[in-house]
């Protein structure tokens, strides 16, 4: 089954060019199926890009999925047209009385700030607490993962001496978990961050399980509450050219910008990036949807608790 997306969402036309089948709301209403309801709290500056990246991954499942986009009342985006936000996004207050089968919390370019100094931190905390009783399984990404680990479990973040930037090999530590079904022994994950969470801090917290990590980039996936929460420190959702755009953007601002590791062919930025993470990204999201959302959520969505 395809994704059900709001009519006129830009991602629809972009993904049709990639031969991904999506369905707008008007057509989806003709199918008498209870779709899975996934809400995305999109904190990234380039919201349309992030929408497309996530919708692309959510499309690789036979299940019908209805996607909602949540915005913060305490923050006004500067890089996305207000008309787009008004048409496709709803405030937390509008969505808080509803329940969802799954939720995705994206990263945000604020990782060097203390959490309490972030203008929308109180609203984020409220949303995180709400998700525990209104969502079957929540996927926290990059800064979202760090923020979730800090809010729920007190896990601190630590500054890195150098930006973690590139594609890094990850090892699944418990291949028997459904989230890793079909995975190879190693898988690649894009990373782009200035801070980290550390194994020694996570190991102090009962109920947190490190399920994937890298000898070079550290902890990559943490699971909690039997899969009702996943914290992913990298960006499996990134498009092939995302790190290239970040590299060239930063190069235009200063001269001491390192190449993203393990990304360009022969480490030559004039060459095309090597896409080594796409298959596992699709598998990760499909496994999350199938084993931790679809198979765990009640048929009557109001029974989620």
What are the functions of these language-model segments?
Residues 102:
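Short, Asp-centered acidic motifs that coordinate Mg2+ and/or phosphate
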């Amino acid at each position: 089954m395809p994704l059900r997306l709001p009519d006129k969402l830009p991602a629809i036309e972009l993904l049709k060019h990639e031969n991904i089948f999506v369905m707008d709301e008007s057509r989806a209403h003709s199918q008498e199926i209870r779709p899975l309801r996934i809400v995305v709290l999109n904190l990234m500056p380039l919201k349309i890009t992030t929408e497309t990246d996530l919708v692309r991954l959510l499309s690789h499942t036979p299940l019908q999925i209805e996607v909602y986009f949540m915005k913060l009342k305490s923050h006004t985006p500067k890089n996305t047209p207000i008309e787009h936000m008004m048409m496709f996004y709803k405030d937390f207050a509008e969505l808080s009385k509803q329940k969802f089968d799954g939720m995705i919390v994206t990263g945000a370019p604020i990782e060097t700030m203390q959490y309490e100094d972030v203008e929308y931190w109180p609203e984020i905390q409220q949303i995180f607490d709400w998700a525990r009783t209104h969502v079957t399984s929540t996927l926290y990404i990059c800064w979202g993962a760090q923020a979730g680990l800090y809010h729920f479990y007190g896990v601190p973040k630590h500054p890195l001496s150098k930006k973690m930037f590139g594609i890094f090999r990850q090892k699944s530590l418990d291949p028997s978990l459904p989230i890793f079904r079909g995975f190879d022994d190693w898988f690649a994950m894009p990373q782009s961050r200035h801070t980290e969470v550390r194994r020694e801090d996570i190991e102090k917290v009962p109920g947190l399980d490190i399920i994937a990590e890298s000898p070079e980039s550290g902890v990559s996936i943490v699971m909690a509450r039997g899969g009702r929460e996943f914290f992913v420190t990298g960006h499996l959702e990134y498009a092939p050219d995302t790190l290239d755009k970040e590299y060239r953007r930063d190069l235009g601002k200063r001269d001491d910008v390192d190449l993203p590791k393990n990304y360009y062919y022969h480490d030559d930025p004039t060459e095309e990036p090597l896409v080594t993470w796409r298959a596992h990204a699709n598998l990760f999201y499909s496994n999350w949807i199938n084993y931790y959302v679809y198979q765990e959520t009640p048929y009557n969505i109001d029974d989620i608790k």
